[in-house]
Amino acid sequence: YEVAPSYEDADAVIVNTCGFITPAVEESISAIGEALDATGKVIVTGCLGERPEKIMERHPKVAAITGSEAVDEVMGHVRELLPIEMDTFTGNLPVAAPGMRPQVDRPQREDVAHGDVFAPTVKLTPRHYAYVKIAEGCNHTCAFCIIPKLRGLQVSRDAGAVLYEAFRLVAGGTKELMIISQDTSAYGVDVRYRESEFQGEQVRAHLTDLAVKLGEMGAWVRLHYVYPYPHVEKVVELMAQGKILPYLDVPLQHASPTILKAMRRPGAGRQLDTIRRWREICPQLVERSTFIVG
């Protein structure tokens, strides 16, 4: 199969959705409708796919709906919608059609060896930056958040798999690696920080160890969705040393102790003390956050 640059050139469309907040749900529903109008053949996947009734009440003509990280299931539906032309002499080997080739980062031997189920298949960002997912899911039970229901509990990738992916991206021209997960600070907790191989070395699945290795690759390393765990201080020290970008995306969400308690979130005072300490270690630190007003 080939990735098409527009609806006009596509035989089917896969819509990757978000079901986290109402505007994202509406945007996803709108995108599904737009794709249906353009091609008539639409497969819906992603977070909103975990709530199929929400999709079917607005768009009952979608071809299929899957949940998050359902790559094999999505591809099964693609094959049903668009059977591949088979060559008589090569059996099940697909015949390549002329046209545009996607920019593909196929799972390599190292990914398979580490059981890496999150290895990307198609890179959709511009060449100069890329998102690198290090884990999927979340172990927290915040009162307001639907993520654990949509994404499940945290599953961390092996450090070796993450580093091999990052290495290939940088070798291919990527200048900035954006590290993402639902809870980046908790990376490796679920696998007890197990070690895996990267270029002949054993590396722990731990945020500090991962940051050290990523910082040696010659690209900007930007950390997203970092919560103020104690070990993040070590990561801030790496920032002060110029190893990774002095940037943290920290979702603090509110300043009221009463509201935070109702949200089942840590207290504001403790978080502010942590941030002050980070700034003492790395004065050039830039922090991005989101807050509820009211």
Task: For each feature predicted by the language model, list its residue ranges.
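Proteins enriched for Cys/Gly/acidic motifs involved in redox and nucleic-acid/cofactor modification
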Residues: 1-187, 206, 248, 269-277
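Conserved SAM/AdoMet-binding glycine-rich loop
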Residues: 42, 51-52, 171-294
